[in-house]
Amino acid sequence: MLKKIERGTMFIQTQSDLFRCPTCHQMMHAQEKALVCLEGHRFDVSKKGTLYFLNHQIKTDYDREMFEHRRKLIVHGMYQPLLDLLQPFCQNQRILDVGCGEGSFLQQLNEQATLSPSVGFDISKEGIYLASD
């Protein structure tokens, strides 16, 4: 089984075209365990397999416990009617989930619609860390 950093590195090596530099908006390419733009801005894959694009930390009120409860609600069908509506439009599509939290909604959608490689962004490190589990 691959380590998280190895999974993250493999993803950026095959899907770097999904990303643009948040600083200068240039295209990015994989360079070892990082995404690098033409201007030299570098974003390293963390040990948890994630990328951190913000230029400073943002304090949020969202903690691990809140994201765990959110995951339970989604996994147990709270948004199933919405997932059912989205599924026909998402088949084999790339999805960008902005504000993905711990990633359970995108994961549920992928299980129903077989998505192309997709990406979730969130400002909460706790949510992203859970998403990478």
PLM regions: where:
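Short beta-strand element of Class I
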Residues: 116-119
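Conserved SAM/SAH-binding beta-strand->alpha-helix loop
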Residues: 122-126
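Class I SAM-dependent methyltransferase Rossmann-like catalytic core
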Residues: 60-81
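N-terminal auxiliary segments of SAM/dcSAM-dependent transferases
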Residues: 2-59
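Conserved SAM-binding loop
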Residues: 131
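Conserved class I S-adenosyl-L-methionine
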Residues: 92-101
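Conserved alpha-helix/loop element of class I SAM-dependent methyltransferases that forms part
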Residues: 76-92
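Conserved SAM-binding loop of SAM-dependent methyltransferases across substrates and taxa
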Residues: 102-114
